[in-house]
């Protein structure tokens, strides 16, 4: 849970900015968007497999460029 303590003499705008930054760093908004709708386990698995394939292809391209140089 993200929380901040407003310092003496601190404006509301700067406290709100710190709170939003802490929320972004904690990944709260991305988690809310991910959980907005129910996702079947089969769809989750399919997305994970696709993500792994993309990462492997990216890694393969990265290392093939290093070998050529």
Curated annotation (Swiss-Prot):
The keyword Ribonucleoprotein applies. GO terms for molecular function: structural constituent of ribosome. The gene is rpsU. GO terms for biological process: translation. The keyword Ribonucleoprotein applies. Keywords: Ribonucleoprotein, Ribosomal protein. Residues 49-69 are annotated as: Disordered. It comes from Leptospira interrogans serogroup Icterohaemorrhagiae serovar Lai (strain 56601). It holds the Pfam family Ribosomal_S21. GO terms for cellular component: ribonucleoprotein complex; ribosome. This is Small ribosomal subunit protein bS21. Belongs to the bacterial ribosomal protein bS21 family. InterPro entries: Ribosomal_bS21, Ribosomal_bS21_sf.
């Amino acid at each position: 849970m993200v929380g901040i303590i407003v310092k003496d003499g601190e404006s509301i705008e700067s406290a709100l900015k710190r709170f939003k930054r802490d929320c972004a760093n904690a990944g709260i908004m991305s988690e809310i968007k991910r959980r907005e709708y129910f996702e079947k386990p089969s769809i989750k698995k399919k997305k994970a497999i696709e993500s792994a394939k993309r990462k492997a292809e990216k890694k393969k391209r990265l290392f093939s460029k290093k070998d050529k140089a």
